[in-house]
């Protein structure tokens, strides 16, 4: 960064509370993306939980990770810009961290900037229960992110920060782009998602997390035989649905604003 001001085209989107900025008309493989993203996410800038860079039908996340909510947001933006969109349409997109094409079913939701977006999520690579110290966690690995499920009711009381530190240590010898920890309360089907992006060397508590809800859904299917549930997130809801061995995540998306951002 040489002191010049960069002007970027942005779209601010709210997928179930997980505020996402998409940057358009920019080199999606620019080496400064992590730095730019950190700046954009600040409270004094556009204030968001994550940033993605879009070109045609591809979404490149700030740390090269996969993100379900950003993918739902991107498909909803395509619908918002699509002159032929009326009530419902399917959009096929790709996202960093995932080699498969992603299919997203976008429907209207009461206003021209509001949608419901249902995405077919990637299959997990592995699903297991592990012990870290004396805590039991689910571990669901995807190609773009690994998610840990921490069942609050089935573990002894501890601080979330302690679990985050233990997970970082557990992964210290692994090459990964991002990990999540879903702090899950089975009594009221709610969760508090935490996501750490290695490239940025920082993590945040998100207001909702689609890939984390997917991981939780696979975990609940295997260990609790629950193949559909609306999971309450800190600032909204996401529903996972398992049909014919495929996992779908459905929920609201709102296009909030678009314009220029100065970095």
Curated annotation (Swiss-Prot):
Domain of life: Bacteria
Active site residues of this protein: 67, 209
GO molecular function, one term: diaminopimelate epimerase activity
EC number: 5.1.1.24
Alphabetic keyword roster: Isomerase
Reaction(s) catalysed by this chain's protein: L-histidine = D-histidine
Gene3D superfamilies assigned: Diaminopimelate Epimerase, Chain A, domain 1
Mutant lacking the gene: phenotype: Knockout of the gene results in a small but reproducible lag in growth compared to wild-type strain during exponential phase. Depletion of metal ions from the media results in the growth curve of the wild type organism approaching that of the deletion mutant.
Family to which this protein belongs: Belongs to the histidine racemase family.
Function: Cofactor-independent isomerase that catalyzes the reversible conversion of L-histidine to D-histidine. May play a role in growth of F.nucleatum.
Assembly notes: Homodimer.
Protein name as annotated: Histidine racemase
Species the sequence originates in: Fusobacterium nucleatum subsp. nucleatum (strain ATCC 23726 / VPI 4351)
Recorded name of the encoding gene: hisR
């Amino acid at each position: 960064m040489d002191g010049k001001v960069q002007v970027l085209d942005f779209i601010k989107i709210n997928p179930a509370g997980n505020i996402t900025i998409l940057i358009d008309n920019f080199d999606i493989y620019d080496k400064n993306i992590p730095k730019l993203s950190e700046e954009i996410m600040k409270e004094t800038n556009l204030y968001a939980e994550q940033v993605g860079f879009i070109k045609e039908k591809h979404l490149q996340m700030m740390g090269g990770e996969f993100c379900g909510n950003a993918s739902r947001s991107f498909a909803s933006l395509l619908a918002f810009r699509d002159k032929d969109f009326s009530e419902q349409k399917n959009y096929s997109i790709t996202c960093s961290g995932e080699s498969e094409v992603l299919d997203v079913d976008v429907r209207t939701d009461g206003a021209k900037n509001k949608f419901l977006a249902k995405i077919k999520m990637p299959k997990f690579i592995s699903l297991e229960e592990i012990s870290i110290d004396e805590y039991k966690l689910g571990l669901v690995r995807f190609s773009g992110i690994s998610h840990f499920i921490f069942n609050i009711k089935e573990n002894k009381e501890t601080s979330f920060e302690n679990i985050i530190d233990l997970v970082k240590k557990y992964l210290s010898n692994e090459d990964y782009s991002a990990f999540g920890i879903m702090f899950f309360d089975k009594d009221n089907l709610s969760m508090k998602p935490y996501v750490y992006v290695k490239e940025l060397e920082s993590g945040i508590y998100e207001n909702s997390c689609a890939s984390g809800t997917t991981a939780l859904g696979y975990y609940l299917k295997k260990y609790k035989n629950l193949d559909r549930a609306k999971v309450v997130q800190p600032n909204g809801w996401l529903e996972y649905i398992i049909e014919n061995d495929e996992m779908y995540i459905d929920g609201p998306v709102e296009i909030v604003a678009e314009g220029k951002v100065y970095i």
